[in-house]
Structures are given as C-alpha cells and as structure tokens.
Amino acid sequence: MTTEAKCPFNHAVVGTGTTNRDWWPKQLRVDLLSQHSSKSNPLGQSFNYADAFKRLDLQALKRDLHALMTDSQDWWPADFGHYGPLFVRMAWHSAGTYRIGDGRGGGGRGQQRFAPLNSWPDNVSLDKARRLLWPIKQKYGQAISWADLMILTGNVALESMGLKTFGFAGGREDTWEPDQDLYWGRETKWLGGDDRYSRGSPGVDEAHGVLVKDDDSQVPHTRDLENPLAAVQMGLIYVNPEGPDGNPDPIASARDIRDTFARMAMNDEETVALIAGGHTFGKTHGAGPADNVGAEPEAGELESQGLGWHNRYGSGKGADTITSGLEVTWTTTPAQWSNDYFDHLFGFEWELSKSPAGAHQWVAKNADAIIPDAHDASRKHRPTMLTTDLALRFDPAYEAISRRFQQHPEQFADAFARAWFKLTHRDMGPRSRYLGADVPAEELVWQDPVPAVDHPLVDAQDAAALKQTILASGLSVAHLVSTAWASATTFRGSDKRGGANGARIRLAPQKDWQANQPEQLAKVLATLERIQADFNAAQSGGKKISLADLIVLAGNAAVEHAAQAAGHQVTVPFAPGRTDASQQQTDVESFAVLEPVADGFRNFAKRRYAVPAEALLIDKAQLLTLTAPELTVLVGGLRVLGANVGDSKHGVFTSRPGVLSNDFFANLLDMRTEWKATSEAKDEYEGRDRSTGELRWTGTRVDLVFGSNSILRAVAEVYASADAQEKFVHDFVAAWTKVMQLDRFDLA
C-alpha cells in the first residue's frame, strides 16, 4: 500500500464533499439567520466599538492619512505622485454596493475585504489600496474599524486634493466573514447580465476582462433591471463604463446610470455631481491587453497573501497597470479639485477610440496633448472620456445640470461634497449612530430624522395606568398587536432604517400601505391619539408620552393581557423615549421602499411572487436581525394573537384566539391532521382530520414551513412540547421586545 493510499485525508477534508445544497438547491436558507455570530468575532462579546472609537485620536489619524497620500511606494507607485484618487475609488466602491431596495450592501460592515467583493472585476487593484492602509490600521488597532477607515481615507483623500468635504461620521462596525444574505444576481460569469436582464451580456470566463460590444443585447434603452439589484452586470458597482453591455452609446448609458443611481437613492443632481466629482481625479488603467492579468485574490496562491490580479504586462505596475482595461485621464488636475471635467466635457468634440486593452473610450478631436502622464512628467496626452461621461453631455437632464455646474463651480463643489457624504453614510441609519468630532451639524431629510426628546418621560406607574386605559378602550388584542408590529417592523438591519421611533405609521406613505390595513389603522390611531391627548393634558411639569411610545406600549399591553389569559403573569419591557416625526421630516419617495410586499409574520402577500413565500419570510426575518428560534416563536405567537392582515384565519391554529398559547405548534405538528394544497399554485392549504375528513384548519406556505423544513420543525417541536408553554410565553416576550426596540440605538 502506498503512502498516499494510507493517508486518511486524501480527499475527505472537513467541509468538502457533496453538500445539502448540492442535493437540494432550493433548500430554504434558514442559515442566513445565524450569520455573524460571536463565534466568528475575534474581539469578543465584551468589545464595544463605540467606546473604542471615542478614545481614538481622530486628528492624529487624519494627519497620518494625509502623509500617506503622497508617500509613494515602489511596490505600488502612486499615479501623479498621489494616492488620493485610488483611495477615493476604494471608499466609493465600499459604499457604492448599497441599494435602497433592501438596504443591503454598502460600506457599513467592511465587506470589501471579503469575497465576492474583494475579487469583483470592478475592484481590481483595491487590494493594493487596503495594503497601503495596513500600517495605519495596524497602528491604531481596534480604535477604528476597517469599515470606518476605508470611508475616512476617501474623505481625507478628497481634502488632501483641495475639496472641502461635508463631514465624516464613524460608527461602522466590522464583520468577520462574508455576508451570505446579499443577492448579487444569478449570473455565473463575471460581467454577465443575462439573468438580471431578459437579454444581457453572457459575461466572460476570466475574473478580469474587457467587455466589448455584445450583439445579443438589442434593447439597451428600454430594458428593466431585476430588483433589488443596482448594478448592470455581475461584478460591477453600477454601470459598464463602456456603455450598456459594452455598447458605446451615451444616451443608452444615461438610462443605465439613472436607473442604477436611483436604486442607490441618488437623484439626477447627485448623480451628476458624483460622476463628475469622482472623475475630476485620477485615471483608469488599461495599459495593455487584459489577458496579461492573473487570478483574482480569492483564486490566488498562498504566496500571494491575499493579493490578486498579478499583471505580466511590463513592470505590472505604474505606467503598465491594467484594471478596467480603459485608459482615460479626465482632467489636467488629476490630483487637485477643479472644474476641468466640465470644461473638457463641453469644450471638445469626441470621437470613439479604443484603449490599448481594446476597450471602447473617447478621445478629444483635434485636441492638443494637455493631460499629464501619471508617471512620466515629460509626456502629455490628449483628453479622454468614457461613454458614461458623455452621458452627462447628451442626456438632456444631465446636460442641464452639468452646464449649471460648469458655470457655478461653487454649486458643483457643494453638491459633490453633500452627495459624497450621502453616498458614504446612507447605510448608517439615523444620526444617533454617528460618532466623532467631524459629524456635520446639519440635519438631512434622507437621514430619516426624528425630533429630540424635549420633555420628561413617563415612568413605570404612568405606563401601567396607560395600559389599563388602552385595554379598556374597546380596541382588541389583535388590533393593538398588529398596529405595534406594523409600526416597528419597517426596520431593516441592513441600513438601520425604519422602526417604531417617529410614529411614521400615521404619516404618508405608511398610513396607506395595504399591509397596514388603512381603515383599521385609522381607527386604532384615532383611539390612541385620544388617550395620548387626555394623558398629556393631565400632566404637570411638561411630562408627555409620544404617539410612537404609546403605539408600542399598547402592543405590550395586549401581549401581557394575552399571556395572562394563558395563565402567565408577565411584564413586557418598555423603554420610553421615542418621538413623533413630522411629514416634513419624512421623504415619501424614500420611505416607499420600506413597504412590505410580503410579511409572513402577518400572513400577508401583496400579490403572488415567483419567490416562495417562505423564502420571503426568511428575508424579512433576516432584515429584522432575528434568529431561527426568534422567527419561530414570533410567528407562532402572532398567529394565536390574531395579527393576520385582513383578519385571515390562515395559520390561526387555535380554538382560543387572543390567548398567548403554544397552540399553533401543537396543532401544526398534530399527526391527526392531513394537509393538502387547495390549488396548483400550492400557496394555501387545508388541514383535515385523517379519520373523518373534517376540515380543521387552513394555512399558507409560511405556516406549514414550520412543520416541513427540518430546521424550523426542530425549533417548532420545542415549543409544541407539553412542558413548553411557559418558555414559549417568555421567549415570545423577549423576541417581541427585541423587535419593538430595534431602532432604539440610544439604548445600546
């Protein structure tokens, strides 16, 4: 027997082999609810990043970053002697993965360090940017996260190149493993777009390539991008700089730009400011054919130490660098803020050309060589632009904004500074999460502001009295629970938006959402507002309760009442301090994306979707930062409390609705019931007595999944057990309280 044959680890290495998802590709991703546990965090559960950041000498750190900008390293020389443009790109590409549709992506978790982002074709050479930063990160240690450092470095880069920035806020905590919940698309090749569009690019086989015109893409002006994606091709941040699928069509490119930037919550003015401002600096890199570039970081050898895209062309760096395959420098001041970009955009006529790598780009007709070389002071080049740049000239709306910025440089500088701040802070949530001395004082509507507390808060005695008044008001347990749930569960852990604070459930657009049952909601709110007014009028010393607090307190009262009906005395924790936002503080268009298209917790779906209802339930639970046990206990409790939209009886597996019992689980797992779908769509089911055929219950996919999915069933069996009633009540109260307080960052 050979030595190789004797080795017990010839193939059987831990984690390899055929997986469950290989066997069952459509298996429900319950594992998404257990991401980023304390087991992956080397800092331990006791580490408090906010406290660590407060001890940071921010000004000293910024001085070190300023020095780094012009400290060119031989192993990766700085273009134009300044790393600023590289670091602006790093920060932009960290924040720029954010999409407003589900709030996921963005720079708030430091995910650019991990796959797939660290190996995206659009992120070529950003591995070098992070390595340039490593000595500074090493020096300041855990006082600043990678997530904060990448954004701060982009800010300092802009300042070092002459722009007055709007401000900077820290508070982004690092994660320690790749996000698994982000849907980047289903394409299996880099730069592919053939799934997100009905007819898009098939992509390339290599991790780095230049995509030229794709004749299969017939309708770039009218195509619709799949939601919630905000990038036109797999591995790009936004758009293809050559044009849609490599078609060098500025007007079609403008459509892609408008669509993708809107999905990152940017309007036309912000879009123009960001593109023009970003392209005021630096250059793109396409010194030679793309086939000179090697594997991305995740496919690299051990000796590469996490660096990728080894370039065999010339020196492989400096003047020989290849990233996008494009070779464009926009301005005569690539390391200094200026208005050159617009002067060149409108001052020249442009003709189509190709980079040394074969990518479509544009060169100024009959122009002198006025653009400096990045590494040879004796050389000059003709002005060049990307197809996406020309979109700002030939799209009528973009052109009007661009010409105004050209004529009013001060407006351009201010618009870019503000848009950059929004780009890099959009996923951080409310201002209460902002840390540091550079936080701007101005309140912005996209931050979803709420008023500060300016009055004494209610105490425990007040809360107890209010709960009695609420329960005597004639409002049902179901109405109180569903209203509190609807108010709190707009929250998204992805971008920290939504939640009960602000009581925006009484404002447009939330008051009119189908899931919120507008007619019922109006009656509940009217009653609660009367209770609020009576209480506040009776107080002395300015004590008040906000409607936001009262909505949550009312839900708590209903839960306590239902638990008492089940034989359990509980007090649901309540922390006053929420305030009521105004309609003027609420951007209707921005809040519209928070509308639930489906909420399995309330057995609601706005319509039938291609995605199974149980998968949408997992998505909702993940955005609410729930674990699998929390998801399970909440669904079971909400069903018996009657919180379904439209008073639907689906999933109400109890003969005593309004009582906080574990009946949902006991009856779902009862083998005396046989379940059958009521239609070929298999979205609703009947449960009949196996012996008599008598109808016992009706349910939906999000009900039956707790008996069907092996992981969720394992949890459901705990709560269905004969000894589980008390545990069920206490676990429900804990999970309910967590949801009610998801947006209470002031309590952390």
UniProtKB/Swiss-Prot annotation:
<comment type="similarity">
    <text>Belongs to the peroxidase family. Peroxidase/catalase subfamily.</text>
</comment>
<comment type="subunit">
    <text>Homodimer or homotetramer.</text>
</comment>
<comment type="function">
    <text>Bifunctional enzyme with both catalase and broad-spectrum peroxidase activity.</text>
</comment>
<feature type="cross-link" description="Tryptophyl-tyrosyl-methioninium (Trp-Tyr) (with M-264)">
    <location>
        <begin position="92"/>
        <end position="238"/>
    </location>
</feature>
<keyword id="KW-0408">Iron</keyword>
<keyword id="KW-0479">Metal-binding</keyword>
<keyword id="KW-0349">Heme</keyword>
<keyword id="KW-0575">Peroxidase</keyword>
<dbReference type="GO" id="GO:0070301">
    <property type="term" value="P:cellular response to hydrogen peroxide"/>
</dbReference>
<dbReference type="InterPro" id="IPR002016">
    <property type="entry name" value="Haem_peroxidase"/>
</dbReference>
<dbReference type="GO" id="GO:0020037">
    <property type="term" value="F:heme binding"/>
</dbReference>
<dbReference type="InterPro" id="IPR000763">
    <property type="entry name" value="Catalase_peroxidase"/>
</dbReference>
<feature type="binding site" description="axial binding residue">
    <location>
        <position position="279"/>
    </location>
    <ligand>
        <name>heme b</name>
    </ligand>
</feature>
<dbReference type="GO" id="GO:0046872">
    <property type="term" value="F:metal ion binding"/>
</dbReference>
<dbReference type="GO" id="GO:0005829">
    <property type="term" value="C:cytosol"/>
</dbReference>
<dbReference type="InterPro" id="IPR019793">
    <property type="entry name" value="Peroxidases_heam-ligand_BS"/>
</dbReference>
<keyword id="KW-0560">Oxidoreductase</keyword>
<dbReference type="InterPro" id="IPR019794">
    <property type="entry name" value="Peroxidases_AS"/>
</dbReference>
<dbReference type="GO" id="GO:0042744">
    <property type="term" value="P:hydrogen peroxide catabolic process"/>
</dbReference>
<dbReference type="InterPro" id="IPR010255">
    <property type="entry name" value="Haem_peroxidase_sf"/>
</dbReference>
<feature type="site" description="Transition state stabilizer">
    <location>
        <position position="89"/>
    </location>
</feature>
<feature type="cross-link" description="Tryptophyl-tyrosyl-methioninium (Tyr-Met) (with W-92)">
    <location>
        <begin position="238"/>
        <end position="264"/>
    </location>
</feature>
<keyword id="KW-0376">Hydrogen peroxide</keyword>
<protein>
    <recommendedName>
        <fullName>Catalase-peroxidase</fullName>
        <ecNumber>1.11.1.21</ecNumber>
    </recommendedName>
</protein>
<feature type="active site" description="Proton acceptor">
    <location>
        <position position="93"/>
    </location>
</feature>
<dbReference type="GO" id="GO:0004096">
    <property type="term" value="F:catalase activity"/>
</dbReference>
<dbReference type="Pfam" id="PF00141">
    <property type="entry name" value="peroxidase"/>
</dbReference>
